[in-house]
Amino acid sequence: RKLGYLDGCRKFGIKVAEEQKIDCFMSVGGGSEAAEQLMAQSELPEALFTTNDAIALGIMRKLQEKKVAVPEQISILSYGGNEWNEWVTPSLTTLRLPIEEMSSACVQLLNTMLTTGEWIPISRIFQLELEYRESCTKTEK
C-alpha cells in the first residue's frame, strides 16, 4: 500500500518529504502515536493518507483532542472500507478494498494449487472504490 501510494505521488509530481512518511502499528493506538509525531513537526501537511482505517481513526481522535480541525486544517483518507467509517465524526473518506473479490480470487488460486500440486505465483490488481466523505475537502488543484 505504502509503495503504491508513493509511486502514485511520483507519477503526479507530488513530493512527499521524508519526515512526512510516518511508520506506525496498524491500529488506533498506532494512529494516535503517528499523530503525535505529525504534530511535533513544524507544519501540518495539507492531507494524510493512511494504510488502514484504524490508523486514520487514531489520528482523527488525537487531532480532535489537540483541537486540529478535520478537514478544515488537514484532510484524511484511508485504505479499507470499514462500515463504521460513515459513523465517525467527521465521516472518513476511504478507498474501499474489494474484499469479496479478493477473497474469491484467493480461494480459486488455493483450489488450483491443491488440485494441480503446483505453486502458482500470481500478481493481480484489484479496482478500489473511493468513498468520499467529510474527512476530505475538495480542492481546485
Regions found by a protein language model. Name each.
Residues 1-141:
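Bacterial carbohydrate/catabolite-sensing allosteric modules
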